[in-house]
Amino acid sequence: MPEVERKPKITASRKLLLKSLMLAKAKECWEQEHEEREAEKVRYLAERIPTLQTRGLSLSALQDLCRELHAKVEVVDEERYDIEAKCLHNTREIKDLKLKVMDLRGKFKRPPLRRVRVSADAMLRALLGSKHKVSMDLRANLKSVKKEDTEKERPVEVGDWRKNVEAMSGMEGRKKMFDAAKSPTSQ
């Protein structure tokens, strides 16, 4: 069956209109967030920084005020420097640890596992340690079985081969072979 082309549920012009509306809404939200951030920044600074009353202060009072402000700025700068140093140290340490992890991943590839034959003695040595000397000869408990000599039971007749060939030739030879094949089953 040939596939029928489906018409899109929404036309291209409608899609473009919706996209432009979404972009306009996103821009409006972004501008609103930006204004809120600026307002929050102004509010925070107003809370943290007290207004200075410099009117009516003498020269020595202004100099004392400047010294206090400079001392506060130095303390804040020292704290900022310490925090930056700690951050830099931590980022370097993280980077070094990441490199070590990458190195270790590259070095140790897991080999494909193979079956290994382990004797009972080797397994006990691995489990108990090398100090304990335990031998487990499992073959010692097995019964010994002698192989039966099948060749001794059947005596092989060795004769003149020419007589065998002459005896087996012709119809009588075939009859002898047929009778010989019958005789072991009948016994």
Curated annotation (Swiss-Prot):
<keyword id="KW-0514">Muscle protein</keyword>
<dbReference type="GO" id="GO:0014883">
    <property type="term" value="P:transition between fast and slow fiber"/>
</dbReference>
<feature type="modified residue" description="N-acetylproline">
    <location>
        <position position="2"/>
    </location>
</feature>
<dbReference type="GO" id="GO:0003009">
    <property type="term" value="P:skeletal muscle contraction"/>
</dbReference>
<feature type="modified residue" description="Phosphoserine">
    <location>
        <position position="58"/>
    </location>
</feature>
<dbReference type="InterPro" id="IPR038077">
    <property type="entry name" value="Troponin_sf"/>
</dbReference>
<keyword id="KW-0597">Phosphoprotein</keyword>
<dbReference type="GO" id="GO:0005829">
    <property type="term" value="C:cytosol"/>
</dbReference>
<dbReference type="Pfam" id="PF00992">
    <property type="entry name" value="Troponin"/>
</dbReference>
<comment type="function">
    <text>Troponin I is the inhibitory subunit of troponin, the thin filament regulatory complex which confers calcium-sensitivity to striated muscle actomyosin ATPase activity.</text>
</comment>
<dbReference type="GO" id="GO:0005861">
    <property type="term" value="C:troponin complex"/>
</dbReference>
<dbReference type="InterPro" id="IPR001978">
    <property type="entry name" value="Troponin"/>
</dbReference>
<feature type="region of interest" description="Involved in binding TNC and actin">
    <location>
        <begin position="97"/>
        <end position="118"/>
    </location>
</feature>
<dbReference type="GO" id="GO:0006942">
    <property type="term" value="P:regulation of striated muscle contraction"/>
</dbReference>
<keyword id="KW-0007">Acetylation</keyword>
<comment type="subunit">
    <text>Binds to actin and tropomyosin.</text>
</comment>
<comment type="similarity">
    <text>Belongs to the troponin I family.</text>
</comment>
<dbReference type="GO" id="GO:0060048">
    <property type="term" value="P:cardiac muscle contraction"/>
</dbReference>
<keyword id="KW-0009">Actin-binding</keyword>
<protein>
    <recommendedName>
        <fullName>Troponin I, slow skeletal muscle</fullName>
    </recommendedName>
</protein>
<dbReference type="InterPro" id="IPR050875">
    <property type="entry name" value="Troponin_I"/>
</dbReference>
<dbReference type="GO" id="GO:0055010">
    <property type="term" value="P:ventricular cardiac muscle tissue morphogenesis"/>
</dbReference>
<feature type="region of interest" description="Involved in binding TNC">
    <location>
        <begin position="2"/>
        <end position="48"/>
    </location>
</feature>
<dbReference type="GO" id="GO:0003779">
    <property type="term" value="F:actin binding"/>
</dbReference>
